[in-house]
UniProtKB/Swiss-Prot annotation:
This is Putative non-structural protein 3b. Signal peptide: none annotated. One of its GO terms (cellular component) is host cell membrane. It comes from the Viruses. The keyword Lipoprotein does not apply. Its main location: host cell. It is found in: Host membrane. It comes from Porcine transmissible gastroenteritis coronavirus (strain Purdue). InterPro entries: a/bCoV_VIROPORIN_3A-like_CD, a/bCoV_VIROPORIN_3A-like_TM, Coronavirus_Orf3a/b. It is a multi-pass membrane protein. Belongs to the coronaviruses NS3b protein family. The chain crosses the membrane at residues 47-67, 75-95, 102-122. Pfam families: Corona_NS3b. Residues 41-131 form the CoV 3a-like viroporin TM domain.
Length: 244
């Protein structure tokens, strides 16, 4: 990534070195005018090669500005690198004469930071900048990125157990799942509650949060043999209950 950001800088270094060599040769050469014309042609060729390199640099800077991760430590590392790029690396490139690289790096990252700072100001939560996203979900004060569905429906599914659930890389313990709620803030605004707790065969649970109640859950993952085994267990339990 770092190499892709400064391909244009390397191009200008090559052009500058080539110009210095040619200028030194011009002092000792008899046909000075002809050499100057040849030097101009070489620099023009280098300038034409600069455009695709500039495009690649812009793409890499944009990728860095928009890249997001769900891991807390990764987000902290990326945020620190962005701050260093805006406050140190970009101005340093401008000071050394690499104006295009410095201006593009500083401008793109700064605009993204200002855009996310608006959500930070409105919701008073720094996690918008940390996770580099415009929409977060908050589960009892713990923030995590909110992923929209394909139809832009607002619902959340969290994996967990009988008295806990995982929120990103954190574990939330609870007594009653019906007391757990999720607040969606940012570009979307919604308050979700638990509408269904789906128990898996291994004893774990999938908790469904939605604004609309869940009527039922259709299970199509089991084979016929597993379904027959479950039916037999249910019949045995019912039979035991009737006898008692």
């Amino acid at each position: 990534m770092i190499g892709g950001l400064f391909l244009s800088t390397l191009s200008f270094v090559i052009v500058s070195n080539h110009s210095i060599v040619n200028n030194t040769a011009n002092v000792h050469h008899i046909q000075q005018e002809r050499v100057i014309v040849q030097q101009h042609q070489v620099v023009s060729a280098r300038t034409q090669n600069y455009y695709p390199e500039f495009s690649i640099a812009v793409l890499f800077v944009s990728f860095l500005a928009l890249y997001r991760s769900t891991n807390f430590k990764t987000c902290v590392g990326i945020l620190m690198f962005k701050i260093l790029s805006m406050t140190l690396l970009g101005p340093m490139l401008i000071a050394y004469g690499y104006y295009i690289d410095g201006i593009v790096t500083t401008t793109v990252l700064s605009l993204r930071f200002v855009y996310l700072a608006y959500f930070w100001y409105v919701n008073s939560r720094f996690e918008f900048i940390l996770y580099n996203t415009t929409t977060l979900m908050f589960v009892h004060g713990r923030a995590a990125p909110f992923m929209r569905s394909s139809h832009s429906s607002i619902y959340v599914t969290l994996y967990g157990g009988i008295n806990y659930m995982f929120v990103n890389d954190l574990t939330l313990h609870f007594v009653d799942p019906m007391l757990v709620s999720i607040a969606i803030r940012g570009l979307a605004h919604a308050d979700l509650t638990v509408v269904r707790a789906v128990e898996l065969l291994n004893g774990d649970f999938i908790y469904v949060f939605s604004q609309e109640p869940v009527v039922g859950v259709y299970n199509a993952a089991f084979s016929q043999a597993v379904l027959n085994e479950i039916d037999l267990k249910e019949e045995e339990e019912d039979h035991t209950y009737d006898v008692s």
